[in-house]
Amino acid sequence: MNTRIAKFTKETTQQLTTFNSTTRQKTIFVPKGETKVIGEVKGTGYISNIWITFPGWFYQWWNPPAPISQTILKTLILRIYWDDEKLPAVEAPVGDFFGIGLCEVGNFANRYFGMSSGGFFCKFPMPFQRGFRIEVENRDQVVDTDIFANVLYQLDPDLDRDVGYFHTHFSTGKGLTEAFEMCSIEGRGHYVGCSLSMQGEQLNNLSFLEAPEYV
């Protein structure tokens, strides 16, 4: 039985968002070739939910002419930094991070990731001891984009110090004939899984799945 819901804690729930309550602007603009910080938080706690969307998808209803660019799922890089670290713990294309590795949008959901109504979500618990920063880099050579994002987090001064930090590793390859190493990691931690996307060099030809694949 999960009795945590009945336990008194010092947690406070807060939200980081691109919505500006003064201007009523919902998004931040990320021109091609630029990096923008979505937000930065100081304190001890954990992220419990990340939700993000782009023009022409979730909010196409109030902005019908908004262009739709699925390539932005590969060219927009998401980075998350923990505790003032110089290197990001998360660095991956937004599509791959949320489980859409081939830029083909489709609704799905599992325990930790999913896409619904044009928005992407991640519910992995992500602890931090001193704070976090989230930024995005637009590496697209043609497309500027807007981002609408909400990050739900809990500040908890009593957070267990013996917890791991959430990390990702992104790898990609083409024309592979040898075994492909998805990641090589050393240190204490848990491997929680991967999102694997494959596509044949001949589009819409699934014959490459006829060969034995080993993981």
Name each model-derived stretch.
Residues M1-V215:
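Beta-strand-centric surfaces of beta-sandwich/beta-rich domains
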